Design a protein with these regions (language model features):
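Hydrophobic residues in well-ordered beta-strands that form the structural core
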Residues: 18, 100, 125-127, 237, ...
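C-terminal helix-rich "cap/oligomerization" subdomain common to oxidoreductases
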Residues: 1-3, 74-76, 300-340
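Contiguous beta-strand/loop segments that form the cofactor/metal-binding neighborhood of enzyme cores
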Residues: 191-266, 292-306
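Beta-loop-alpha module in the N-terminal Rossmann-like domain of NAD(P)-dependent dehydrogenases
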Residues: 56-117
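Active-site loop of classical SDR/Rossmann-like NAD(P)-dependent oxidoreductases
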Residues: 17, 40, 284-296
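Rossmann-fold dehydrogenase core element
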Residues: 113-131, 150-155
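N-terminal Rossmann-like dinucleotide-binding module
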Residues: 1-52
């Protein structure tokens, strides 16, 4: 173990999210320590290892060396989506705990394999959804579960970004990405709605389209989708790779409504506002390093030998739901969501 009170990590994948968010978070975490970094670019790995205090750096071909490092207790997987399962299972087979970026994998079958291998080697598996720890989202969850909004009826959520010219090519490669805007940003709408409702959807509908056929030959640019939950709750969701960056989440109940804006971006002031019984409320939440909270929560789960939240099953469910949305778009009909 890296230190008596800190879990040692190897960060696998040094793309944008790692460089701007995950690596800086290790500097401030009291429970997780960066030991090594792994990248396809050894010069970049060396530069970022030196910048952020990792003692060692490796290429993907040297991944086994990172897994054999005596101070590495866990891996944070932030590679392209299509390689999540491979790197996660190799880590688990080396008895390393796994924190994996969303989406968990490109298929339900890969997700199930990840869960089974982690279980067989008695290692923890967590999916990197920050909403479970971010204070504004937690406050909204508490408001919903308190019953003050009454019985939930409708949720609206969207996450849109405008991919700039020169964006990494893997975003447009179905084999590497698994999909387009739905799996990259729409997944937040899917996961957060399930978390708030406290139930899983039973039916999915979807519609996908693109305004740039030359740029989006393999994956979708825009998605509009609907999830039907038990007891009549419905989520209307949307995601885009071709709209200005924004995100929101609106929750409507019989007694009131609440909204979170922005809902999913990090390092921004969040507003939680709404109306209950004719009375307006609003609270602002200053930016907080959600990645530190995520790292600390996973490290604590490892130390206490308990299943983290959100675990691998939550990631699998989101992948299954998104596959149902895609199937609905292909077949132009609602698709039952089967999560048994």
């Amino acid at each position: 173990m890296a230190a008596p009170n800190r879990i040692g990590f190897a960060l696998v994948g040094l793309g944008n999210i790692s460089e701007v968010a995950v690596l800086p978070a290790f500097r401030h975490s009291k429970k997780a320590k960066l030991v090594a970094v792994v990248s396809g670019d050894k010069r970049k790995a060396k530069r970022l290892a030196m910048k952020f205090g990792a003692s060692d750096y490796y290429t993907y071909d040297e991944y086994v060396l990172a897994l054999n490092h005596p101070q590495v207790d866990a891996v944070y997987i932030a590679t392209t989506n299509g390689t999540h399962a491979e790197y996660a299972m190799r880590a688990a087979q080396s008895c390393k705990h796994v924190l994996c970026e969303k989406p968990m994998a490109n298929s339900v079958e890969e997700c199930q394999q990840m869960i089974e291998v982690c279980r067989a080697h008695d290692v923890r598996l967590m999916i990197a959804y920050r909403k479970y720890f971010e204070p504004a989202s937690v406050a909204l969850k508490r408001l919903v579960t308190s019953g003050k909004l009454g019985r939930l009826r409708i949720l609206h959520s969207a996450f849109t970004i405008n991919l700039p010219p020169g964006s990494p090519a893997w975003h447009f490669d179905k084999k590497q990405a698994g999909g387009g805007s739905l799996v990259d940003v729409g997944v937040y709408c899917v996961n957060t709605s399930r978390w708030l409702v406290g139930r899983d959807p039973v039916e999915a509908s979807g519609y996908v389209w693109t305004d740039d056929p030359a740029g989006f030959r393999e994956v979708e640019e825009h998605v509009a989708f609907q999830l039907k939950f038990p007891e009549g709750v419905v989520l209307q969701g949307s995601s885009s790779f071709g709209a200005a960056q924004a995100s929101f989440l609106h929750v409507h109940g019989e007694k009131g409504w609440a909204a979170l804006d922005p809902a999913y971006e990090f390092a921004k002031v969040r507003r939680l506002f709404g109306e209950i019984g004719g009375r307006w409320f609003e609270k602002r939440f200053p930016p907080i390093d959600e990645f530190v909270l995520e790292l600390d929560a996973f490290a604590e789960a490892i130390r206490r030998h308990r299943d983290p939240e959100p675990n691998g099953l939550e990631g699998l469910k989101d992948v299954a739901i998104m596959q149902a949305i895609y199937k609905s778009a292909r077949e132009n009909r609602p698709i039952p969501v089967l999560l048994a």
